[in-house]
Amino acid sequence: MKFKVLNISTNKSSTIEVADTVFARGFNQALVHQVTTAYMSGGRQGSKAQKNRSTVSGGSKRPWAQKGTGRARAGTTRGPIWRSGGVTFSAAPRGYAQKVNKKMYKGAISVIFSELARSERLKVVSEFNIKEIKTKNITALLKALNVKDVLLMTDELDENLYLSSRNLYHVGVCDIQSIDPVSLIGYDNVVVTEIALKKIEAML
């Protein structure tokens, strides 16, 4: 499979060839859904907790005698039908992490990249070449590429690129070590450098 590589400085383009096994795979919705759900589940805090009848404060003593008062029997004031009593089916802290093996994770990333390439939403540039921290540089870059909602991807984190773009709505920056399925799906377009593309191919 071939990609057009745009040189932003000279406005000239060349081509780069990559493996079809990585960037031309068939779409597997079930795999992408499973890996994406597992990734999002891993980010859940899972610290929610409520008190049940055994942990809520209050006495375990009978509030009144079993017989003779004319009132209904009551064994404790900590039951769920009492004010300030425990919760019936109380939530407890738990982990939401789901196991996904490396082959599945890499496969899902590859499938997403393939779908982006197929729909012409994956663009390749020679380099971003952001020399100074200025938002207008990123605005000009996006205008040249004709993209708005976009994830900019480099082989290593570019501090100038990150700081220049963080004030722009719907523009994300990441390096290839930080690739995740949610970010790839969450943006309309992905722009990646030529070096990063080759490294992604080697990774997957």
From Swiss-Prot:
- Compositionally biased residues, Low complexity: 68-77
Q: Does the keyword Cytoplasm apply?
A: no
Enumerate the residue ranges of region (Disordered).
41-77
UniProt KW keywords = Ribonucleoprotein, Ribosomal protein, RNA-binding, rRNA-binding
Q: Determine the domain of life of the protein's source.
A: Bacteria
Q: Could you name the Gene Ontology cellular component terms for this entry?
A: ribonucleoprotein complex; ribosome
Tell me which Gene Ontology terms the entry assigns under biological process.
translation
**Pfam families referenced in this protein's UniProt entry, alphabetically:** Ribosomal_L4
Kindly list the GO molecular function terms attached to this UniProt entry: rRNA binding; structural constituent of ribosome
Asked whether the UniProt record includes rRNA-binding among its keywords, one would answer yes
Q: Could you tell me where the Polar residues compositional bias lies?
A: 47-58
Q: What is this protein's function?
A: One of the primary rRNA binding proteins, this protein initially binds near the 5'-end of the 23S rRNA. It is important during the early stages of 50S assembly. It makes multiple contacts with different domains of the 23S rRNA in the assembled 50S subunit and ribosome. Forms part of the polypeptide exit tunnel.
Its assembly, as annotated, is: Part of the 50S ribosomal subunit.
List, alphabetically, the PANTHER family matched.
50S RIBOSOMAL PROTEIN L4, LARGE RIBOSOMAL SUBUNIT PROTEIN UL4M
Q: Which family does it belong to?
A: Belongs to the universal ribosomal protein uL4 family.
Instruction: Give the protein name, as stated in the record.
Output: Large ribosomal subunit protein uL4
Q: What is the lineage of its organism?
A: Bacteria, Pseudomonadati, Pseudomonadota, Gammaproteobacteria, Candidatus Pseudothioglobaceae
